[in-house]
Amino acid sequence: MNDNFKKQPHHLIYEELLQQGITLGITTRGDGLSDYPKNAFNMARYIDDRPYNITQHQLQLAEEIAFDRKNWVFPIQTHENKVACITKDDIGTNIDTLTDALHGIDAMYTYDSNVLLTMCYADCVPVYFYSTKHHFIALAHAGWRGTYTEIVKEVLKHVNFDLKDLHVVIGPSTSSSYEINDDIKNKFETLPIDSANYIETRGRDRHGIDLKKANAALLIYYGVPKENIYTTAYATSEHLELFFSYRLEKGQTGRMLAFIGQQ
């Protein structure tokens, strides 16, 4: 696949950004220690897996991306739209064990160097933000709830520079095969973007939704230049050899870890 995300042993990396001091990527599912599912490279401590496995996977990833795990930060995601400002004081949060810190956070941003923002995914959209000019990075977790509640808009509220200097990467997530019902479709139709561009009715109470397109449309609506947004062609629901898919695997699966940091 011709994509800016390049395959590595246990992750995909946005390779061209490395020269700019940005480490941006997402883990893949295979060649791990977990039995959930078998031989999975699961990165989530909050599912039925041995803590040892997660720690070993973290150490492996830290070596592959050359970013010490002591500098990672992980929130407790709850499918909402709250954003946290992260500083070097937060590094190490929820990496060895889960705590009450950063609970209910589905987006983070920082202007600090040597901090790796991380969150878990298994169909939801990872939205990465960066500006090398202003030394800003952010990461958002946008499932249908986060998309509907405009989590990308909430992140943009914390950008204190001209949006022409902001770049956004929309990462691997479910495709338009993801279906919603009438009630959820009606919610999306209240957003300030044309739902016809990302929702397709397929039958009674059945509508396909492309959450990548919805988030891109929201970003453009709120002022991010279209040419500054990159959307990967990778889809969790279409590349099960690479990714976990919560919906296709009926919840019995692991989680990938999306990450972004700046040197």
Swiss-Prot record:
Q: Disulfide bonds, which pairs?
A: none
> Is Oxidoreductase set as a keyword in this record?
yes
Q: Does the keyword Zinc apply?
A: yes
Reactions catalysed, as given in the entry: adenosine + phosphate = alpha-D-ribose 1-phosphate + adenine; S-methyl-5'-thioadenosine + phosphate = 5-(methylsulfanyl)-alpha-D-ribose 1-phosphate + adenine; inosine + phosphate = alpha-D-ribose 1-phosphate + hypoxanthine; adenosine + H2O + H(+) = inosine + NH4(+)
Q: Which domain of life is it from?
A: Bacteria
State its cofactor: Cu(2+); Zn(2+)
Q: What is its EC number?
A: 2.4.2.1, 3.5.4.4, 2.4.2.28
Task: Spell out the SUPFAM superfamilies in the cross-references.
Answer: CNF1/YfiH-like putative cysteine hydrolases
A Pfam family that the UniProt record links to this protein: Cu-oxidase_4
Q: Name one GO molecular function term.
A: copper ion binding
Q: Which UniProt keywords apply?
A: Copper, Hydrolase, Metal-binding, Oxidoreductase, Transferase, Zinc
Annotated binding of Zn(2+), by residue: 79, 124, 141
Protein function: Purine nucleoside enzyme that catalyzes the phosphorolysis of adenosine and inosine nucleosides, yielding D-ribose 1-phosphate and the respective free bases, adenine and hypoxanthine. Also catalyzes the phosphorolysis of S-methyl-5'-thioadenosine into adenine and S-methyl-5-thio-alpha-D-ribose 1-phosphate. Also has adenosine deaminase activity.
**In which family does this protein belong, per the annotation?**
Belongs to the purine nucleoside phosphorylase YfiH/LACC1 family.
Record note on quaternary structure: Homodimer.
Entry protein name: Purine nucleoside phosphorylase SACOL1200
**Organism whose genome encodes this protein:** Staphylococcus aureus (strain COL)
